[in-house]
Amino acid sequence: MQPRDKKLRPHFALVVATMVVLGLAHGWVNPWLGFDRGAIEQGQLWRLLTCHLVHLNHWHMLLNLAGLVLCGYFFTDLLDRVRFWSWLLFCGAVTGLALYFLDTGLQHYVGLSGILHGLLVYCLLQGWRGNPWLHSLVLLVIAGRIVSEQQAGYDVEYLRSWIDGRVYVNAHLYGALAGVLLFGGITGVEYGRKRRTGNTERR
């Protein structure tokens, strides 16, 4: 499986390294970078993005880093610098804004898992034509899991002994939907670019 963009590697490594540093220093950086409704209302809008890069503890960071690295490995033929940074910025912003405007009772939030769902959904949609059966199956599993997380009685505390907090399932929903929007947006832009290139070549 050939990488789509070999120059993505240092960009990917930069994000991973940033998460490791922030994860190791979570006790110091979380008060400044985590989702904090009161602080956001006072103008600290960067928290809508940076909240996805910080974590509750080292285990929380490692779990999400493992997911990110696996996505980077399995979808190396689909990701390039534009798509990667579009995911981080677009899904980060959309998920952060959704948490702020839709979950008005939410006061604090940290973690990559929400937008990690967005990356996974985006890559599965982007690569669907190459392996439709497998990608459809995984998308159905993700959709089923998200639906189950939204059901009353779902145990949001199942990872508390590891991550020192509950799983905030709405972030998974918002992140996955952001991934769908990202796929639509990038597909539209790339299709438009190809059409313009084709029209130019025919002239």
Each PLM stretch: what is its role?
Residues 1-46, 71, 78, 89, ...:
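N-terminal signal-anchor transmembrane helix
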Residues 14-86, 90-96, 101-109, 161-171:
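N-terminal TM1-TM2 helical hairpin plus the immediately adjacent luminal interfacial "cap"
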Residues 23-27, 75, 100-103, 147-153, ...:
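Transmembrane helix-loop junctions and nearby membrane-interface residues
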Residues 49, 93, 118-123, 140-148:
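Small-residue-rich segments of transmembrane alpha-helices in multi-pass membrane proteins
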Residues 64-69, 116-122, 172-186:
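Hydrophobic cores of alpha-helical transmembrane segments in multi-pass inner/ER membrane proteins
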Residues 96-101, 123, 143, 180-184:
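Alpha-helical transmembrane segments of multipass membrane proteins
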Residues 105-138:
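A contiguous pocket-lining binding segment that forms or flanks enzyme active sites
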Residues 140-187:
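Terminal transmembrane helical module of multi-pass membrane proteins
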